[in-house]
Amino acid sequence: QAEESCLQNLASRYLQTVTDYGKDLVEKALAPELQAQAKAYFEKTQEQLTPLVKKIGNDLLNFFSHFIELKTQPAT
């Protein structure tokens, strides 16, 4: 009985060790892939947003310069 319990305990610890090792291995294998996907996503987002942000900035400058021109014109 005691020997059987010892073998079950040993088998249980072995299975837990193998399971933990497998989880660590999967995490290590997926980490670079996920990092690459995240980097590609952020680069694509930046590539798409940069022209939009520049256009918005240009439009705002034009908008405010229009009001400045109205203030500087003499009243008729």
Curated annotation (Swiss-Prot):
SUPFAM superfamilies: Apolipoprotein A-II. Plasma. Signal peptide: none annotated. This is Apolipoprotein A-II. The modification Pyrrolidone carboxylic acid is found at residue 1. It holds the Pfam family ApoA-II. Keywords: Disulfide bond, HDL, Lipid transport, Pyrrolidone carboxylic acid, Secreted, Transport. It is found in: Secreted. Homodimer; disulfide-linked. Interacts with NAXE and NDRG1. InterPro entries: ApoA-II, ApoA-II_sf. Coiled coil: none annotated. It comes from the Eukaryota. One of its GO terms (molecular function) is high-density lipoprotein particle binding. The gene is APOA2. Belongs to the apolipoprotein A2 family. GO terms for cellular component: spherical high-density lipoprotein particle. GO terms for biological process: cholesterol homeostasis; cholesterol transport; lipoprotein metabolic process; positive regulation of phagocytosis; protein stabilization. May stabilize HDL (high density lipoprotein) structure by its association with lipids, and affect the HDL metabolism.
